Amino acid sequence: MNDTTHATDAAHSPHSTQQHSMRALAIAAIGVVFGDIGTSPLYSLKEAFSPAHGIPLTEGSILGVISLLFWAILLVVGVKYLLFVMRADNNGEGGVLALMALSLRPLDSKTRVAGALMALGIFGACMFYGDAVITPAISVMSAVEGLEIATPHLSHLVLPITIVILIALFWIQRHGTALVGKLFGPIMVLWFVVIAALGVYHIVRVPGIIAAINPYYAASFMADHLLQAYVVLGSVVLVLTGAEALYADMGHFGAKPIRYAAYGLVMPSLVLNYFGQGALLIQNPKAIENPFFLLAPEWGLLPLVVLSTVATVIASQAVISGAYSLTSQAIQLGYVPRMKVLHTSELAIGQIYVPVVNWLLLAVILCIVVGFKSSDNLAAAYGIAVTATMVITTVLACVVMVKVWNWNRLLVGAIIAVFLAIDLGFFGANLLKVAQGGWLPLGIGALLFFLLMTWYKGRHIVKERTAADGIPLEPFLQGLLAHPPHRVSGTAIYLTGNDKLVPVSLLHNLKHNKVLHERTIFLTFVTRDIPYVRDDKRQSARDAGGGLYIVKAEYGFNETPDVKAVLEEFGRTHDMTFELMDTSFFLARETVVPTHLPGMSIWRERVFAWMHQNAAKPTDFFAIPANRVVELGTKIEI
């Protein structure tokens, strides 16, 4: 009997383990991926019926708006992102930069099309930051505003409580969130169950709201109200904030667990809650004051405020972590100057902290909270960054479908036409809100786009100038060995950006010190257009003879170069040992000098020179002991 039982368990264990793993990943994804979109019910419907839109609270208009919300979630989240966009993974990784890298792969990088796609991808990434400063502000503020419903005499504390929560959230970032992160999934599962239950309670009382599933009501609403209805689309898109996160976080959890969570819990819960809010408004139009919190019975208001606040903090955490990850990717791809990136967990590779980004985000978010004062005012600023990124994602996905997957062009045209019609409709509606607050994310995105493009162009010019004046490395080394300078004991590592050219730091060392170490390694780091590089493909080394080695280490854009790991691997394959504290690292400290040479306008060159000067030192970025570094200065005119 026991043998049979064990045999049966063994036979079923792979499947049960796989199911358990899927559920565990889905729950983890719910805690990270769906925080933003999951907290949208706090403000979306309320904003759609803003008095500024002039839409009467009749049963017909309520059914029309709920129908628009339903079909927006179904088509954009359920079809576009979950079924189509998430197929376009870059070796398992998602997000606008990963999609951009994938779309550029089959193209000649020097063509105008490639340049336009690169600019689109970078602009999409910049708009993410425009979104990242609004999400924590509007999410936390809208949750704390529940106090105005639960205990009106505490309404004056909404702003101070919001500020305290946000400061605390950003302060804990440097300590890592791995421990509390384990609770995010279960808490967000509870959140979705609660908002679904609240919705069902009111749907049962007004079952007629289910008719909003019929797209006729959405079309009728648009036809009856025309321009007003188009303005309302700018608020309807608030239900989609966070949809891009489904794709961006795909590398952390995988497409299947995200789809599993979305179709199994998240989308049904959101739809039920929105329909419940619609039912409440049909029954009591005065509930438009705050339809989300008024779903709850009086005894449940304070617990719901607490749960909402925790859920919005989790949603904000996901956006903050996303900003760190995107910054790290952009650094590796060469679009952003080097910044100090700290790993906050020894177990989770993706747990990073970027101090500069953290404190800049907090400063801007606090200014936004104090300046806009309420989630109603801030809602006008929300949406334009989201819709701009949605349009860019659709365009890049189109290129991937045609150039990478070789899909039929007519089929791709039909699919993209539908998605672009929806995306551009939402984007156009949000452009109408530029004066009311939409200028904020657009301004942030435009400023960052200018800085990133200036940095990318400047680095390209520096590389061209360096290559034009450079000396081929291997012939130089052969000549050096034929007429060797004085050799000194020890190991020297020359970090260089081009493994084909002689490092400027070597030339200066030979010129001033006239010595060469017995063991000399020329180390170059290269970032590939894939998220991760396999360990067995990471490193290549050439023995130039006489104790001279040329080593190239390749990393994906989701990885951080590790000097120590590279030297350990090189030592294993070449039967050597390295002690960082006994090794000298030679670096060229470049000083960029703006000139009137062809390249960029002089004022942009000055901006680039300032960025170059303030980039993180290589010792910080590569985690090299500062007392083992020899920096030799060089000037580069651009």
Swiss-Prot record:
Q: Which residues form the signal peptide?
A: none
As its record notes, the protein acts as a catalyst of: K(+)(in) + H(+)(in) = K(+)(out) + H(+)(out)
Q: Which InterPro entries match?
A: K+_transporter, K_trans_C, K_trans_N, Kup
Q: Which GO MF term does the entry hold, naming one?
A: potassium ion transmembrane transporter activity
Q: How does it sit in the membrane?
A: Multi-pass membrane protein
Question: Which keywords describe this protein according to UniProt?
Answer: Cell inner membrane, Cell membrane, Ion transport, Membrane, Potassium, Potassium transport, Symport, Transmembrane, Transmembrane helix, Transport
Q: Does the keyword Nucleus apply?
A: no
The subcellular location is:
Cell inner membrane
One Pfam family assigned to this protein is K_trans
A GO cellular component annotated for this chain's UniProt record is: plasma membrane
Is GTP-binding among the key words of this record?
no
Residues spanning the membrane: 25-45, 65-85, 114-134, 152-172, 184-204, 226-246, 262-282, 291-311, 352-372, 382-402, 410-430, 434-454
* Main localization, broad class: membrane
Family in the record: Belongs to the HAK/KUP transporter (TC 2.A.72) family.
Q: Could you tell me what this protein does?
A: Transport of potassium into the cell. Likely operates as a K(+):H(+) symporter.
Q: Give the matching PANTHER family.
A: LOW AFFINITY POTASSIUM TRANSPORT SYSTEM PROTEIN KUP, OSMOTIC STRESS POTASSIUM TRANSPORTER
Q: What is this protein called?
A: Probable potassium transport system protein Kup
Source organism of this protein record: Burkholderia cenocepacia (strain HI2424)
- Organism taxonomic ancestry: Bacteria, Pseudomonadati, Pseudomonadota, Betaproteobacteria, Burkholderiales
Give the encoding gene's name: kup
